[in-house]
């Protein structure tokens, strides 16, 4: 009997030992052998980069370079790549265009050839979003149709698309105009007292565009929308911290201060949105007409999709899905337009000849009247200026995908588990595409449209390209055109003496040390 127990104990011990060894091997394979195998395959195909460092990869080196780059402002020019992505810039200069870096244990190749870029963006089912390599809590913010793949992405995009048709955008214009009118009227009153008015424009446009989103997304529930925006701003700051860290699986479950706060904010936002959505759904079921805002259009489109699918439970979006899309409306819509208006104002301050050209065009089209949709879309100089600002200061500095199986890309076979980065801010400065003046602000390059400016290459990516091109790009451009036109009708502007040129990236490209601009009322009132 005693011998039997001894055998059992040894068997249990042997089993535990075997399980521990199997687990240790899996961890070692995940953390060391797999990255080294991928590195070997990349090097065999001519890719070059730093050797893999256990778990951290290039994170420490990249972080140090990033800190150094941001510690000092720069001259006012558009050579912002060394400041925004110093480690990528250093790697490409050191190892060439066919190079790779390490995001922890994940290798990331840089793709800069137009034909390969087109291939990546055309085959979105192979080259997918890479949110899975981050802390899962990142998905509290980076969610919705932009983060989905496959059938779920296709269904969500189909349901959401009706909210962004030209007809719907046209109906949003009055709400845009009210928000801009209220802000500019305040500026005029302050400028009348003091002769001019100095504004830190990025936070001002940030709040303004959030007001616009609140109005067009939630209509009559605008006040609740404002509260959601404030919580989302805090969630964005915490999300950025998460994305800068090397993610260790399971870390999101630990009760750290940041993890707890992110979960609290997400619950609060989710509860508020659920209340708004349930109220709308009850009204629709009671036969009341839907509201003509983004949420109203989304809910009606969702009901139609469910009916088309034979009222199947999984035929449309769930309430939770709608909540995630509302978060995306807020974050993407507000951030993109806010930074676009900010950099447009700064660049037009530095190029007064283009400011004057745009103003003359706006005044000829509208005089002092409120801009209207049809003619707004035919403002050639204003459109060219916005395209050029998006080239030099795109909202996001790169598009990064991940592949989950070995994938042929041009002459290369990219190993599964590799990230593929399209460095947008670099591509937008390629002299072979844009000419010798690629670093200069020259809206004339877009006089004959984007295709002509890029020589029909897929190298202009402020809103991505292909099947996953940003649904809201026309929303952002229309709002920016209206805002810029209304500002030009009333003010001349120049950067304040205190302005320091220091672009940096917090999800989007923003001014690091403020964005102070001086506005002076136009003397000419009889247009």
UniProtKB/Swiss-Prot annotation:
Its cofactor is heme. Gene3D superfamilies: Cytochrome P450. Heme binds at residue 470. It is found in: Endoplasmic reticulum membrane. It catalyses: loganin + reduced [NADPH--hemoprotein reductase] + O2 = secologanin + oxidized [NADPH--hemoprotein reductase] + 2 H2O + H(+); secologanin + reduced [NADPH--hemoprotein reductase] + O2 = secoxyloganin + oxidized [NADPH--hemoprotein reductase] + H2O + 2 H(+). Residues 1-11 are lumenal. InterPro entries: Cyt_P450, Cyt_P450_CS, Cyt_P450_E_grp-I, Cyt_P450_sf, Cytochrome_P450_Monooxygen. Disruption phenotype: Large increases in loganin accumulation. PROSITE patterns: CYTOCHROME_P450. Expressed in leaves (especially in leaf epidermis), and, to a lower extent, in roots, stems, flower buds and flowers. Pathway: Alkaloid biosynthesis. GO terms for cellular component: endoplasmic reticulum membrane. Component of the seco-iridoid and derivatives monoterpenoid indole alkaloids (MIAs, e.g. secologanin) biosynthesis pathway. Catalyzes the conversion of loganin into secologanin. Catalyzes the conversion of secologanin into secoxyloganin. Belongs to the cytochrome P450 family. This is Secologanin synthase 2. It comes from Catharanthus roseus (Madagascar periwinkle).
